[in-house]
Amino acid sequence: MFKEYKNFDATGLAELLEKKEITPGELLDEAIFQTEILDPLINAIPQKHFDLAKQQLENKLGSPFHGVPFLLKDLHASLKGTITSDGSRLNEKNVAKFTDTLTHRCLDAGLVIFGKTNSPEFGLTVTTEPILHGPTRNPWNL
């Protein structure tokens, strides 16, 4: 277990990986562990793609963020084979047929996408309270 995980941003995690102080698998395991503990409290990650993320671990070796866990916003971001709902019940079964350019760039940079985050319906409000997945709570104000 990597207890200091929450003290690092993506750049800091990439630096630890580059120095081989931790492995991509260990980082992903910690991200999954933290998600399983915290998400029931805040409801931020309705789509968990842990198995898909494990497949991504060997991709893009040598990329600047190779092995850094990453969450993709479920708002106009397509990752082939996953639901792209945009926070709407209208799209709750919309499986992406392709991976969009921005998501490809994240993957090309070596980021490991392990889930999609909750979003307001079509991004139309400033708070995340969609009917589809329910509200996301402020982690600093539980």
Residue ranges and their predicted role:
Residues 2-142:
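Gly/Ser-rich catalytic/binding loops embedded in alpha/beta enzyme cores
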